[in-house]
């Protein structure tokens, strides 16, 4: 800044000390300096005012610029957020665009498939229309042929109806003629029926007499068997005594037999075996004949009637039970079979209708080769021979249990109106029921004689195997019949 001008009071003080001329110059110079300073001050004031105005204007502009900058920052932030949203929207739109492209491809492929399917359906529709046309033509042809068949069969039915009416008329006339003939023959039928009934009674009497004779023969046979068994027992006892005497007399008897016969024999075993048989054989009870068996409790023995031979080896150990049949086992090596018997008979024991007959004494072991002829037979009779020994079971009944014995004929004049055969009874009536044994399949001969007594000919046990009866008729004389019961061991004509 310029120097501050000197005030007039100070100038006056200085001038007072100086001459008057110099003071005037100084005053003039001072006045001039004051004027200059005044002008300069005025100029500075004016410049100051101008600068103040400019400062206020610039401050206002600065404030407006600050406001604009804040607005620009806010607008920039808004634009940045909007840009980010736009970018996210663009990404979403790109994803949607990709999805839409894939959907468009799928739809185009589906469209192609639908076009192909539509073409196939169109082809099928055309084929169905053609088939329908063909079936329609066939249906029309079938309808036409059906009408022709209907007319044809209607004519045939009319013809058959006419023939049937004619046939019915003829049969009615024939039936009336037969009815009149039957009415005229009633008297002859009654006479013939009475004659047939009388003949039937005569035949029944003959059968009963025949059965009685057979029972007597079997009784005699049982007695003879008992005597033979006692005789055989005595012979065995004598043979055992002889062997004991020989062993006492010749202690080296076995060595001599081995030396001479080249066979080893155990005499002690033979003696013990014979003594065991003699101890288990008794003839205390008497054999009795029972006319009719108890069949209700015999069904459990049917399976044992056809048991095959078991335990056939020689000199097997025996159980302690009473034997009721005589069996000759294979004798030991070195001794003939007829020299030392291996078993002895015991007294026949009878259980219900069972009579025990030894095997070697039965005359029914071999079936007859040719059946014997008997006429007018009505009673079923069968004999079965069974034996066992050494726990062996020999059944001569084969595969038949002889459960039921019935005559099978195509026609029986002795049947009543109910289909049941009339049976004549003598003494106690013998039912033609099951014939089974209660003697645990021991050796026996089973005998049964049955006479029909008017009961049904069917037996209680219809499920077992049946002995078959074969009936043959003479074509020249129907009243004669050969009836035979077949058994695996023997057959008896009755």
Swiss-Prot record:
Question: Which residue windows does the record flag with biased composition (Polar residues)?
Answer: 1-12, 291-313, 363-381, 417-428, 472-494
Q: What segments bear the compositional bias annotation Low complexity?
A: 13-25, 385-403, 429-462
| Subcellular location field | Endoplasmic reticulum membrane
Please state the protein's primary subcellular location: endoplasmic reticulum
Where would one find coiled-coil regions in this protein?
A: 24-173
Which Pfam families does the UniProt entry name for this protein?
A: SHE3
**Which GO terms of the molecular function aspect are on file?**
RNA binding
Name any GO cellular component annotation.
endoplasmic reticulum membrane
User: What topology does the record note for this protein and the membrane?
Assistant: Peripheral membrane protein
SUPFAM superfamilies attached to this UniProt entry: Tropomyosin (SSF57997)
Kindly state a single biological-process term from the GO annotations of this entry. mRNA transport
**Region annotation Disordered: where it falls in the sequence:** 1-25, 291-494
Keywords carried by this UniProt record: Coiled coil, Endoplasmic reticulum, Membrane, mRNA transport, RNA-binding, Transport
Question: Main role?
Answer: RNA-binding protein that binds specific mRNAs including the ASH1 mRNA, coding for a repressor of the HO endonuclease. Part of the mRNA localization machinery that restricts accumulation of certain proteins to the bud and in the daughter cell. Required for the delivery of cortical endoplasmic reticulum into the emerging bud.
What is the similarity comment for this entry? Belongs to the SHE3 family.
Protein's name in the database: SWI5-dependent HO expression protein 3
Biological source species: Candida tropicalis (strain ATCC MYA-3404 / T1)
- Could you read off the lineage of the organism from its UniProt record? Eukaryota, Fungi, Dikarya, Ascomycota, Saccharomycotina
